[in-house]
A protein has these predicted regions:
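Extracytoplasmic/periplasmic solute-binding protein
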Residues: 133-135, 142, 166-212, 227
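Short, solvent-exposed loop/beta-turn-alpha elements that line the ligand-binding surface or hinge
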Residues: 108-120, 200-223, 271-272, 284-293
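Conserved N-terminal structural module of periplasmic/extracytoplasmic solute-binding proteins
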Residues: 8-9, 18-96, 286-289, 388, ...
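Extracytoplasmic/periplasmic substrate-recognition and gating elements
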Residues: 30-33, 50, 54-55, 59-62, ...
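Hinge/lid segment of periplasmic solute-binding proteins
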Residues: 90-143, 157, 166, 191-193, ...
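Glycine-centered hinge/linker elements that transmit conformational signals in sensory
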Residues: 169-171, 209-240
Length: 401
């Protein structure tokens, strides 16, 4: 409510400027986000931008697209070239955000210039320099999505431990259903991270070794698990030559029984589908049951760039940032709209488990691409050993000093 009142007051203060801008054609603000494609908040995002345009007389040139490696790479290239947008919805407090920090404005600096705004400085998003740059919008978790109705139809056990996972893979493979939808060539990080969950204890998941000799044995075993799953027929035959959209379509069309993915995948499900979907913790490779940790965090938020801050578009950009991050709009953009069995299983996934950050978030872009796009596919195919994988990764000093 406080933010909503401030936004109304701030907009009122700028009405004369907006009116003048409208008369002169207004200013044009460039925005980039991943509110596009099947994202459930895509429509709400467009509505927010349209409302801002109608109220301000300004124009928003939005370049949103589905979040993938190509999307991230394009954004980082824009920042490197000095052609970044005015407002950006992007990853925060991880390796992805480090390259953009010199060209975005801290929330403390914005709040100092606009004291009534009081953008929330969430400690979870505090960067290594001690500053917070992003207004948080979306938290996330990752898990093993399953079509429970397919499990019932084919008499396959839900993966409550490693043996039941392997049995489910066998049953679905024999019945012409892809057991686990994945793209090894495009987005293999869910598989890599979940393999670590299957093998590593909490302290090992949080380890940041400096040399290959310090790499936990469980990390090596996790890579072996990827090869084990491949040999068991867990993935489609073309998993190494397909993209994320194609592999996800297999799951959405129920041609695949399971998919390792994040909470954002739920935006592609209808309420009816959520009644027969569940998200489960990763089974342990050794021992009983499932992992006592899950992957999660606050993943993304809105940034204001210095390009906008140091231009005549500053007030207009701050007003748009305020509108995008109002309490009401954060709910609209951050709401995953979970219902039914999927909702209850997501709550169970997190209850009583420790949240850990994905390992890739601690790596820089070069190391992450080496691990995920070079090593993981090769390990799955059997052309690289787990030892060779981690030697290659550790040679790049993945976690810094």
């Amino acid at each position: 409510m406080r933010m909503k009142k401030w936004l109304a007051a701030f907009t009122a203060l700028l009405i004369p400027a907006f009116s003048t801008a409208a008369a002169e054609g207004g200013v044009t603000l460039r925005t980039v986000s991943c509110f596009a494609g099947t994202d459930s908040a895509a429509e709400a995002y467009v509505e927010i931008l349209n409302r801002y345009e109608s109220e301000s007389g300004n124009t928003v040139a939005d370049s949103s697209s589905t979040s993938d490696e190509a999307w991230k790479t394009a954004i980082l290239k824009d920042f490197a070239a000095g052609t970044e947008p005015d407002i950006l919805f992007f990853f925060a407090a991880g390796a992805d955000s480090v390259p953009i920090l010199p060209r975005v404005v801290s929330l403390a600096e914005i709040n100092e210039a606009y004291p009534d705004l009081r953008l929330p400085e969430d400690d979870v998003l505090r960067e290594p320099d001690g500053r917070v740059y992003a207004v948080p919008v979306r938290g996330f978790w990752e898990g093993l999505y399953v079509h429970t109705d397919l499990f019932e139809q084919y008499g396959a056990p839900l993966p409550a431990d490693w043996d039941s996972l392997m049995e489910a893979i066998r049953v679905f493979r024999e019945n012409g259903i892809v057991p686990i939808a994945v793209s090894l060539s495009d987005i293999p990080h869910y598989l890599a991270e979940m393999a670590l969950l299957a093998c590593a204890a909490r302290e090992e998941l949080q380890a940041r070794p400096k040399t290959f000799e310090e790499v936990p044995a469980s990390w090596l075993e996790a890579m072996s698990v990827i090869r084990e799953l491949t040999e068991a027929g867990a993935f489609a035959d073309n998993a190494g030559r397909t993209d994320e959209r194609t592999s996800t379509d297999l799951f959405l069309s129920k041609k695949a029984a399971m998919q390792l993915d994040g909470s954002w995948l739920a935006s592609a499900f209808s309420p009816e589908m959520m009644d027969t979907l569940a998200v489960l913790p990763m089974p342990l490779r050794h021992g009983k049951g499932t992992a006592d940790c899950y992957l999660g965090g606050v993943s993304m938020g809105f940034y204001l760039t210095r390009r906008a801050w140091e231009s005549g578009r500053r007030d207009a950009a701050v007003a748009l940032l305020a509108q995008l991050t109002s309490e009401e709009n954060i709910r609209r953009l951050g709401n995953s709209s979970l219902t039914g069995r999927l909702l209850s299983s997501a709550e169970e996934l997190r209850n009583g488990r420790h949240m850990v950050s994905p390992l890739q978030d601690a790596m820089n872009n070069r190391v992450r691409e080496t691990w995920l796009l070079e090593c993981i596919p090769a390990v799955a195919e059997g052309t690289m050993t787990p030892e060779e994988c981690w030697r290659r990764v550790m040679a790049l000093n993945p976690f810094g000093e």
